[in-house]
Amino acid sequence: MDSTSRRVVFFSNEFPNDDLKELFRRLDQHSKDRRFRLLSIFLEESTAVLKDEVSKLPRPLKELVPPFDSVLGLVDVDFRQGPLGAAMESSMLTILELGLFIGYVSLLCLLDQVKMLTSLVYTSHYESEDTEWDLVPGESVLAGLSIGILAAAAVALSSSLADVAKTGAEAVRVSFRLGVYVADISTKLETPQSDGTLSSWAHVVTEMTEAGVQDELRQFNTDTHSPELTKVFISAADKTSVSVSGPPSRIKAAFQHSPVLRYSKSLPLPVYDGLCHASHLYTQSDIDSIINSAESVIVADRSVRLALLSSQTGKPFIAKTASELFLEIGTELLTGTIYLDNVTAGIVQHLQPQSKEISSWQIDSFRTSLVLRGIHSAVEAKLSGEQRQLIRRDLVNWVNKDFGPRQPRSHASSKLAIVGMACRLPGGANDLDLFWKLLEEGRDTLTTVPPDRFDLNTHYDPTGKTENATQTPYGNFIDRPGFFDAGFFNMSPREAEQTDPMQRLALVTAYEALEMAGVVPGRTPSTHPSRIGTFYGQASDDWRELNASQNISTYAVPGGERAFGNGRINYFFKFSGPSFNLDTACSSGLAAVQAACSALWAGEVDTAIAGGLNVITDPDNYCGLGNAHFLSKTGQCKVWDKDADGYCRADGIGSVVIKRLEDAEADNDNILAVVLGASTNHSAEAISITHPHAGAQKANYRQVLNQAGVNPIDVSYIELHGTGTQAGDAVESESVSDIFAPVTPRRRPDQRLYLGAVKSNIGHGEAAAGIASLLKALLVYQKNLIPMHIGIKSVINPTIPKDLERRNVGLAMQNTPWPRPAGKKRLAVVNSFGAHGGNTTLLLEDAPERVKIQGTEDRITHSILLSAKSKKSLQANMESLLSYLDQHPETSLADLAYTTSSRRMHHNMRFGTSVSCISGLQKVLRSQLDNVNFASEVRPVPNEAPSVILAFTSQGAYYHGMGRELFAEFPYFRAQVQQLDRLAQRLGFPSVVPVIENSIEDTPSSPILTQLSVVILEIALARFWSLLGVSISAVIGHSLGEYAALAVAGVISATDAIYLVGRRAQLVEERCAQGSHSMLSVRAPEDEIQKMLAAEPETASIAYEVSCCNTNQDTVIGGLTGEINDIRRTLEAKSIKCTILDVPYAFHTAQVNPILDDLETLAKAVPFKAPSIPVISPLLATVIYDVKSLNANYLRRATRETVDFAAAIEAAQDMGLVDSKTIWIDVGPHPICAGLVRSMIPSAPAMSSCRRNEDSIATISKSLVTLYLAGINPCWAEFFKPREREYSLLHLPKYRWNEIDYWIPYLGTWTLDKAHLKHGTKPTTPFSVSMSRPSALRTSLVHQITAETVEATTATLHTISDMQHPDFLEAIHGHTMNKCGVATSSIWSDMAFTVGEYLYRRLVPNTKDVHMNLTDVEVLHAQVASKTKGSVQPLVLRAHLDLSTSSMSLSWFNANGETGECAAESFATAMIRFEDPMAWRKEWARLAHLVRGRIEVLEQRASEGKASRLSKPLAYALFKNVVDYADRYRGMDSVVLDELEAMAEVTLVPERYGTWHTPPHWIDSVSHLAGLVMNGSDASNTRDYFFVTPGCDSFRLLKKLEPGAQYRSYVRMFPLPEDPNMHGGDVYILQGEEIVGMVGMIRIRRVPRLLMDRFFSPPTTTSVAGPVPPLSGETTKYHDIAQTAPALPAPTLPIVVPNPVASSTMASKAPEPAPLLATSSESSTPKESPIVTPAESEREDPVDNNMISQCLRLMARETGLEVEALTADASFVQLGVDSLMSLVLSEKFRAELGVEIKSSLFLECPTIGEMTAWIEEYC
């Protein structure tokens, strides 16, 4: 406050004359705004105080207070007639005044932001809630009357607004206690009237003096002998009036007794609860009992900060502390007399100016009262004649205002936005448009039960005599309930058939609702998959109990159990938020929505998908509902009709997508409506469990209204539950009318309340009923029309309240406009009640009016994308879009591009184009759809995106304005350029921004500016591509572009790149003459140029240098300018195309020699690091993976020597980094490198970042489309982010499904027949396995003994282990292949030794040492660790020891983690022989010198360079081509490798890392040398194959391996004559000179490398998965893959879990595959580019490019058959395609044709004809 003003804040003792309920509602609404955080704290603290005080009341008083969650919940309760009237009135007045004050002052903090308070003028220095506020001692004073003084005291004790929130709650406590105490004392003086009539305890008398009134009262009290306690007395007085107080009957008697009083002007005051200001009644002990109670949490020593005037003396209270102040106030309230004249005088005295500088007086109050008007008059009288202003401020006005969009204080304070919806409803309402049309036309969807549900001829009996038959034939049913796109949702036909149709349609409608909402998981924080949950209501299991139970299959549980309905949605979309399936009977759907809202308010999710599900098939439910008298026998739900006789059943599926409002607005969503409140309660007091209860329904309405702070009169539409039952309609009409259209206050004529009930149209959808009602309400909001009610067939039900019309409420009997009032929002309520007693209510309001930002749209080209998972769907989606555009030609192209790219989930079948107008798009779509070869030309993209290489151009592409549009449009790109530019300027170089902005003069730039501009642009472009979601696999730089490439690869920093380029340019300018040398681009290879020039005398002696070998046909040469011109003339004369390059210097020639030394010196100061991504080097013509080759000398050479771009590309191809599918992005001002790449690899997709004379945004847009069609998923959200507010999400036609009917009909009459069955079945208990029992044998790998038998000479042992146990799992993950943990055979070795020693000691207890020879090891199926956390992965080991043969057999089996059932066949077997170690020692002693000799030979050959010596890192890097070992497994310190022979120095890690017999990592370390030989030697074809071991003949250790000990291993592998694909060898383990162990005849098999991914699949991604074939797995035997399963330490192969195939009875179509890529080069893309098709160079035969032909040729080649033999009826079994060949074929299809299929497809499509038909549709 300005120090030149004086301020008084006056707290009244009366409520304002406003609608108190509305005032509290508005306070509550503001408290949910984070800008009013302190108001919220105060209300929460006050609520807690009241709850605490109520809890301490005696039971009779406590029962008078209903449960409440906030003070708003008490506003509707009338306490005036009860003993708590004073307490509630006092505390609520305190809360109201302090709440208004806190909110008012909070606004002062917002003044700079909020300019909407035109009726108030504030001057404040508030900056935050914690700053010193403007109620300054000495300048501000507080005053009040009665209870108002308590509110003022809270302010007086506060030094900040935050203090008021805390002390204010204590003032509320004192107010409540004071009221309770006063009422209790007063009722002892006079009993309240029994009829509840309120009598006043105080009257005001005017035009009499205090003395005159006192005389009359004294006389009355004397004459009537009134006891002291009940006497009538004066409680307040001023010059013009006197307040008389006493028991009501005594006051009445006093006025009758005294003629003076009887004829005086007097009025009763609204004081109904007792006496205050009565010194004769209260004592200090009374005051102490209220103020100084032990429960009070007043801080006793809190100082009084502001003066508070006494209402008795008009002077400030003298108290210094809080406790003193409240005692003074309590004394005054209970015993003091109010003297208003003193209060006025005190205020005037405070305002009396002490200085001429005081320019204004300010009085803040809560509305104007008689008392306040008197104060104003007195102050104005004092001001008369003075140049001072009296400012009156009302602290109430602000509460009725809105201050811009609400900013929720917390999730719980947020409004919620419904942003998407979808449905399948009766009457053919398979989408929202059809549903609305049905409603608008007033259609009734009633029909009889369709035959596909059940046969009415047998299951319908209107007499009710037939047991289990229905008595009504009617219902409302959705069309084609079995139709489903199984392939889209990755389900096999078998699984789809077994899955409940309502769960299938939940998937479908969830997708459609998400599509409508524009949800792309992960696009925004609120749509991150971990923050999305699903909530669906379901109340029946018809499909599981009836249809699917006729033949229970594998998918019976996941297909039918309710939880899987939600779980499948979460799993498919990879949502990891909560998944709830709710059953609240008829209200399940809306209860699920309410649960979703609760989760959003609780912050458990950020996006929720909710809905209700019901598909009727089971006649049992018809019978049960009919027998319980729920169902109408006459037809449809007749809501509010006189003849209403029950409901009519209905199907229904509905889904909605909900977010918090602020998230929806931030995400640029279309908001269909806003949820203000949602609640569910129960009719606990109903007369029966199924009977509705009006009281419970009304309580629920109040809860929702209070939650939202909404006046029920403002609600203008209610969608009733409306079932059409006599009880239900009567009760709901009563509850709705009483709350929303009460008798008083009445609705105004313009406040009509309309009612509707969708069940009249589509029946009662049971669990889906609530969601259908909600969808209708949302459509009413969208269409601004309330559809006609068709439920009254005769006359209105007489049980409906008769006065509804007088209350201005009624059904909309015809289509009724429901316009949105200007500047206001419409409110609607949706009801849904459950037959079990539950009541759910939602309160909705209009979406915020969205003002679309009108930008200057200068993007001349837009990308339009469509995708699908099958060709039919893609074609249908294109047709739908074309039809939409034909109907809506005004559609914004920008909005369409935004919607189809940034706001869509994308699939594998893709269409994309870049267009500049809608008509152009229509033309492209028609062209594609008219193409008869559309199906064959459309190619799906691969599941695995192709690699992307960035190619950085040189300075030859420079021009002014390069990237200008990107710089202007994209803040991220602009920021990157500006940051790099600032670095350049700090290094002393000129700014490049004018070049990019094109604000520089169009004159030749200096080399420094040219080169810096190019490098900075390229680094910024590379980062921009990363922002757009492009993952870079490698980089290559051409000349100057190599600096940018090295920076992007992390070899040098961006700063160093700029520094080196700038200094290099400076050196060139200083030491090289411009124009003395030139560069010539020649369209010919180097050798031809040389020959042609040598043949001509004029040029034979010219010295030139080759600067660049760009392609095999493009060469750049350099030299002296004159000589280069001579060469040009000579070559052009020979018709060779030549171009003089527009560069001032001839780089990569002798001209730059003068700068090389200094350049290298500068570069030596720069740190070089290993590249983070491979660098393709045009200097070295290789791919660089490490830092060894990259140094200062490299940059020197790169400046001087030839840029061999062509050789670099060829090297990258040879090294497997580049193939025909690799995508190239030219990063630079103009696509020079892109052209070079296309010349080298004609089929290569190459695109540009910028292009001369083309808008760079358009260039990027086209390139993004090309990337998209190639299988890359760009981050479209970032592309549209700069202008997202300018775009609107369009509601386009929904996805067109490729549906097939998966329906299992109910056959027979067994639901009727079971009524006559008299026998039952005994349930069986499933087998279970417990792994927590004590076990005599427990190690890291052997966890529990499950069976043990020990006899005299034999013993048998069964153990069980869990591969997911941490120790076991860590052992497995020490040996990973293709990112999967695979059990190495050293694990089986340790388990064998563990069990062998245990059993042997059981039979021979006193044995000192047990020496075992592990023989005949055969691992049939590898074991791969499950990726599922928390899963159980058990395996069983069975061992049998026979002492008579000194041997033990072992077998390992997989077991089912749920049932404990052990597999029939083992996955590994072995033998242990208990032998004499002396025999081993003798055997090995004879061999030791031979082994040591071979080791010495290897050492010698290594020293001579004839054998390779590998360091530890290099050895395991070679190993990593197949297997990645953890550190503990990496025991080989060095290796000498000579073709198939090798030796290794080994040091075991000292740690055992667990409990073992022999740690697996030690076994592996001494023995996996054999695997390295086969997988790392030059003698092996490691490019096409990898090598694994299926077993060995023996494994022996003379003594136990020792921690930290050093060993040597030696092996020589050789081909086995019986199998050319198999190698074998012995691994010797030496310690010192002695052989201490041996792996005898380890066998290693060669396996095609293309099967690596098949056997070792990487972890699944979080994106929406691609389609899969119908089988979840297939059986692959070890021998079927040429015995390639693993044994000892070499890599091992997994086995796919068997899953027998059962053909579907209803559908046999296999689902679509993961798609393959179709791309074209950028140059072939027209300005309005249609769908991109395969480049001609990619096709094997330009004449025959049919995919079927390619597939047949591939199959013929791989099987060795002629193509002619592959006839349509030929079966794969007859053709010899076994499981191994199917694996190979599926990999070949992927690798060569880009077709992703599972090998199980050869089982699903057993003939050539079926296979080709499938390929034709999906490939």
Curated annotation (Swiss-Prot):
Free-text cofactor note: Binds 1 phosphopantetheine covalently.
EC nos: 2.3.1.-
Q: Where is this region: C-terminal hotdog fold?
A: 1507-1653
Residue span, Ketosynthase family 3 (KS3) domain:
413-846
Cite the residue spans of the region called Product template (PT) domain.
1339-1658
Mind listing the GO biological process terms from this record? fatty acid biosynthetic process; secondary metabolite biosynthetic process
| Listed Low complexity bias regions | 1719-1730
Region of interest (Malonyl-CoA:ACP transacylase (MAT) domain), residue spans: 952-1249
Q: What is known of its domains?
A: Multidomain protein; including a starter unit:ACP transacylase (SAT) that selects the starter unit; a ketosynthase (KS) that catalyzes repeated decarboxylative condensation to elongate the polyketide backbone; a malonyl-CoA:ACP transacylase (MAT) that selects and transfers the extender unit malonyl-CoA; a product template (PT) domain that controls the immediate cyclization regioselectivity of the reactive polyketide backbone; and an acyl-carrier protein (ACP) that serves as the tether of the growing and completed polyketide via its phosphopantetheinyl arm.
Identify the NCBIfam families for this entry: PT_fungal_PKS
Can you say what this protein is called? Non-reducing polyketide synthase nscA
* Taxonomic path: Eukaryota, Fungi, Dikarya, Ascomycota, Pezizomycotina
